[in-house]
Design a protein with these regions (language model features):
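Beta-strand-rich recognition/accessory modules
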Residues: 1-6
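Short glycine/proline-rich turn/loop motifs
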Residues: 14-20, 129-133
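Aromatic- and glycine-enriched glycan-recognition loops and surfaces
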Residues: 21-112, 119, 146-150
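A sequence-level detector of short, solvent-exposed, charge-rich linear segments
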Residues: 14, 36, 51, 58, ...
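Structural preference for beta-strand elements that scaffold enzyme active sites
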Residues: 12-16, 45-46, 92-96, 162-166
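Active-site-proximal segment of RNA-dependent polymerases
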Residues: 9
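Active-site neighborhood of glycoside hydrolase catalytic domains
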Residues: 73-80, 86-90, 112-188
Length: 188
């Protein structure tokens, strides 16, 4: 009966500015502050900081690293998310953030710790997607589910002022298999 209904579908969506086209992966505090000021001056209501804000051991300066390492890059954002959220508030707009928790790069702390969390066919070499390093996590695995939930829970728990999450899905499915599920539970 309610299939196809959009929650709050009768409400006007906020006018937003997403940082991606402005800076791509070169996220930094001055650029984010300037973009927030600009969208507020134009009457916008929401600023979304896109890809490029995270990474510790492996910094997100190209798209071949850091997916899975959802830690603020303090070299790019020395004052953390708190400062950006306050900047949005001072400009009278809301703050949003980009994540892609189902994805991982082979060059990431997450993959170093849990290579078995990537979708893969046992006995076959991993196939990489975008940038030659991207893979999807095996969401059949309860540990992966907990990890993904934890990303969102951690972000919103520490920063309840985050008003919007852009949950992206850029990685194509290359590895059709699970190291978690037994073979009889897989279709191949």
């Amino acid at each position: 009966r309610h299939a196809g209904m959009l929650h709050h579908g009768d409400q006007v969506r906020p006018v937003l500015l997403n940082s991606w086209e402005g800076v791509y992966l070169d996220v930094n505090e001055p650029a984010m502050a300037e973009m927030m000021k600009d969208i507020a001056a134009l009457g916008g209501e929401l600023f979304v900081m896109d890809d490029g804000w995270f990474g510790d051991k492996y910094r997100r300066v190209q798209d071949n690293s850091s997916l899975g390492d959802w830690v603020v890059d303090r070299k790019k954002l020395p004052n953390g998310l708190e400062n950006l959220i306050q900047t949005a508030d001072r400009n009278g707009i809301k703050f949003g953030i980009w994540i892609e928790p189902e994805a991982v790069n082979s060059k990431s702390e997450l993959f170093e710790k849990h290579p078995d969390w990537a979708l893969q066919v046992k006995g076959r070499p991993l196939q990489y997607g975008r940038g030659g390093t991207q893979m999807l996590l095996d969401v059949c695995n309860p540990e992966v589910q907990d990890f993904m939930f934890g990303i969102v829970d951690n972000l919103l728990g520490k920063h309840p002022q985050i008003a919007y999450i852009k949950w992206d899905a850029n990685v194509e499915l290359k590895n059709y298999g699970s190291t978690y599920l037994p073979q009889d539970k897989q279709s191949h």
